């Protein structure tokens, strides 16, 4: 870690003093902002709330109740809830310019937009009973996000808006917890008007992402390397890279390719001028247990709950010796799916296994040149994805 920091500092000094590695681009103001500040910076109204889950986690939730173009309309607006993916946060939906960020596009289209955060990320790192310094705080995976985080947040939104149903947009792990929650919790599923799944992930049997490589690491060694608390939080080093290293012309492309290695390549569709914003808010962290759960999923090729490591432990949690499988065929929520042909995480083969199991699939589009991150950051995402979502929600109002 210190070696990396030293190298990064050297690059910064050489770049500043001797002009190597190109000019340092002026930083984007959002680099040092929180979610509320990012929203209001662009002139949108913002409301910030804290949602407390049944097991005590405190999640920050943000609301953009209307857009810049329709503030005079005081009537009830359709509610759209956006849920981020793995190692991410609600900033994903507002990191581009307003005409390229889904949250702002939906608000300007006349919708009541809510942004969720999953436990353990930058904006959801508190608990009523446990300190984030404790092992107990980090004893969760996407199982608990589906069981506790989604119901608590959706219930809060329903009560706050007075509307019985909402539209759910999930990206990556945001689709995973949606599949689990809406197939195992029928009362919650009734509150979802339509599920819009971007880069959906259920099984990861064919994934080519870095998670695939981690599957070879035994649990004991995994914990020895990564510990048993937080995995990949955003820290000073990440912020330094974003503002002092990756903002230089010659290193900009190198840094963007580092992101692509994880999720797939599409450099032509990537707005490098926003790279400092992406890197200053990502990764947002999760638990080591959550990452190990994903490695279990790669190994098994199945969509199932976390394996606690022994039949005895599994019986304590599930009343059976093996972790239960998740059955997406039990989810009757109408769902529209978009996936990418070059997605290393949500591999097209895994998506191909998922689609026939969805009993109420209303739309599917595969974008051949899209990778995993294109769905939130691509310059042509409005044309390829977002405009379709807006149209579908609009049709649903009629």
UniProtKB/Swiss-Prot annotation:
Record-annotated disulphide pairs: 246-255
Any one Pfam family match given in the protein's UniProt record, by short name: Abhydrolase_1
SUPFAM superfamilies membership: alpha/beta-Hydrolases (SSF53474)
Residues carrying covalently attached carbohydrate according to the record: 34, 99, 271, 327
Domain annotation AB hydrolase-1: ranges: 78-377
Record GO cellular component, one term: mitochondrion
Catalytic reaction equation(s): a triacylglycerol + H2O = a diacylglycerol + a fatty acid + H(+); 1,2,3-tri-(9Z-octadecenoyl)-glycerol + H2O = 1,2-di-(9Z-octadecenoyl)-sn-glycerol + (9Z)-octadecenoate + H(+); 1,2,3-trioctanoylglycerol + H2O = 1,2-dioctanoyl-sn-glycerol + octanoate + H(+)
EC main group: hydrolase
PROSITE patterns assigned: LIPASE_SER (PS00120)
Keywords, sorted A to Z: Disulfide bond, Glycoprotein, Hydrolase, Lipid degradation, Lipid metabolism, Secreted, Signal
Catalytic activity, EC: 3.1.1.3
Biological process (GO), any one: triglyceride metabolic process
Positions of transmembrane segments: none
Gene Ontology molecular function terms on file: lipid binding; malate dehydrogenase activity; triacylglycerol lipase activity
The keyword Coiled coil is annotated on this UniProt entry: no
First and last residue of the signal peptide: 1-19
Active site: 172 (nucleophile), 343 (charge relay system), 372 (charge relay system)
Primary role: Catalyzes the hydrolysis of triacylglycerols to yield free fatty acids, diacylglycerol, monoacylglycerol, and glycerol. Shows a preferential hydrolysis at the sn-3 position of triacylglycerol.
Family the UniProt entry places it in: Belongs to the AB hydrolase superfamily. Lipase family.
Protein name: Gastric triacylglycerol lipase
Organism per entry: Homo sapiens (Human)
Gene: LIPF
């Amino acid at each position: 870690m210190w070696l990396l920091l030293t190298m990064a500092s050297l690059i910064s000094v050489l770049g500043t003093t001797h002009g190597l590695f190109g000019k340092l681009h002026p930083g984007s103001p959002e680099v040092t902002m929180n979610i509320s500040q990012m929203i209001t910076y662009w002139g949108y109204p913002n409301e910030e709330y804290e949602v407390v889950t049944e097991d005590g986690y405190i999640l920050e939730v943000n609301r953009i109740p209307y857009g810049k173009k329709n503030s005079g309309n005081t009537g009830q607006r359709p509610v759209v809830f956006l849920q981020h993916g793995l190692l991410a946060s609600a900033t994903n939906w507002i990191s581009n310019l307003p005409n390229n960020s889904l949250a702002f596009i939906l608000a300007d289209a006349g919708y009541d937009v809510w942004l969720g955060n999953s436990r353990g990320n930058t904006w959801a790192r508190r608990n009523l009973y446990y300190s984030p310094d404790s092992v107990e705080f980090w004893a969760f995976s996407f199982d608990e996000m589906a069981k506790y985080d989604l119901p608590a947040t959706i219930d809060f939104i329903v009560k706050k808006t007075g509307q019985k149903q909402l539209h759910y947009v999930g990206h990556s792990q945001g689709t995973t917890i949606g599949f689990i929650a809406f197939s195992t919790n029928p009362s919650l599923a009734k509150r979802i008007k339509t599920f819009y799944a971007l880069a959906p992930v259920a099984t990861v049997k064919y994934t080519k992402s870095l998670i695939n490589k981690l599957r070879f690491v035994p649990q004991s060694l995994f914990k020895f390397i990564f510990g048993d608390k937080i995995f990949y939080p955003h820290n000073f080093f990440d912020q330094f890279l974003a503002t002092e290293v990756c903002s230089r012309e010659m290193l900009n492309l190198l840094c963007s390719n580092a992101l692509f290695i994880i999720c797939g390549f599409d450099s032509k569709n990537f707005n490098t001028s926003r790279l400092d914003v992406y890197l200053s808010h990502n990764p947002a962290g999760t638990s080591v247990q959550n990452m190990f759960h994903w490695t279990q999923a790669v190994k098994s090729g199945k969509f199932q709950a976390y394996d606690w490591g022994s039949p005895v432990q599994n019986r304590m949690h599930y009343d059976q010796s093996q972790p239960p499988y998740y059955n997406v065929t039990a989810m009757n929520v109408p769902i529209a799916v978009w996936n990418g042909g070059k997605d290393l995480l949500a591999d097209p083969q895994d998506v191909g296994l998922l689609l026939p199991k969805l009993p109420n699939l209303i739309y599917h589009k595969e974008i051949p040149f899209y990778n995993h991150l294109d769905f939130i950051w691509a310059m042509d995402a409005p044309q390829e994805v977002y405009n379709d979502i807006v149209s579908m929600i609009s049709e649903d109002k009629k």
